[in-house]
Amino acid sequence: MRWCLALLICALVAAVNALSSSGSRLLVVLDDTTEKSSYSTLWSDLEGRGYDLSFESPKSDQLSLFAHGERAYDHLLILPPKSKGLGPALTPKHILDFLNKDGNIVLALSGKSSTSSAISSLLLELDVHLSNDRSAVVIDHFNYDTLSAAEKHDVLLLQRPNALRTDVKAFFDGEGVLALPRVAPQTLGSDSQLLAPILKAPTTAYAYNPKEEMPSPDDIESTGSQLNVVSAIQARNSARFTVLGSVEALEDKWFSASVKAPNGKKVPTVNREFAKQLTGWTFKETGVLKVGKIEHHLATDGEVAAEDLNPKIYRIKNETVFNIEVSEYVYDKWVPFEVPGDDKLQLEFTMLSPFHRLALQPTSRTETSAVYSTQFVTPDQHGIFSFRVNYKRPFLTNIEEKHEVTVRHFAHDEYPRSWAISGGWVWIAGLWSVIGGFLAFVVVWLYSAPTADKAKKTQ
């Protein structure tokens, strides 16, 4: 009995300490163990947020992402290796399998050394493209740190990013300047809806290898906002993969550094706060949606009895109500989900195609969830229909709910009477006019017999 109680207490403590909604086991892969001390503030912050950190070299024989067919870790943080590959346990196939098993990954790159072919192949699988020159970095002659990169201009100074669009939530915004040394440039494929830029390069930036001569404009592959500094991939299973172009931005040095832009003032960096936002989103501390109760029923004036909720069969032209409860995870607690101002959470009432597509409106809320509702009339079409909520937005986990119901015709005793249908009044009037005319004719016939003629007798 005591050991059961002890296990229960341990489980509760672990649940309280683990801020991530998907687990606390974090594997950090770094090639050189001497570099571990350069990121001590990052490790301390992650441990303070409840993560259980494990450090492994990509060359380690004990390294494995899976145990008995299941994930051995919940999250993966890969620092750029100095060798050509990541070892037999971290091939592109193994990493993609980890992603398909709902694992979350942060991949950090660096312009200090050329990117390995294994990482390039992995990113190509995700439609993220690196520069053809593996040693290229992002240069900007207008947004650089004059204190540390007065000549090379390879330490970018950027503002924290705003929301991607007005209908997308902002998870990485805020005040302050980010210092991003020696960024490895990356571009995103245009066909995938699963990719989203977190932080783009300024319009004055371009990518080139500083070891070579200054290129002509025709030799530059990508410039400006085509270049991404930080990119995000959210798979269809809502697993997350973040590509950070500058691993040096996570070092203790840049967490507490002061920088100065051209013609600007000396200001402290906000790299530490941005690192928390970035790892928090990737490891599912933010942007996680959860669906609670889903209810649908016939519209009534009063409260709905439990046995009347979620019926399997509706009738055509029924007034119907649909409710869905949605929560959002924010670091350590569930809160009511609020749809961005220019976005809509929608319900589709669909058979082969939607017969109704309706915006769901917030109707009530609790401390942990918000209830969205709508009311509509079932279509004049019988068949198998579905209540479907399909909400997929950048930086938010997917909501895909589908509940099937049957819609039937009127029963023989449910059709409206003919006198209740205004379109039938003319036919009813014609019927009664014929009956009335016939009765009038009968009366006239019966009471209008011809008189007999009185003829005189003649001999």
How would you label these PLM feature ranges?
Residues 1-16:
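Fungal secretory targeting signals
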Residues 16-459:
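Short, surface-exposed patches at the edges or C-terminal ends of soluble domains, predominantly
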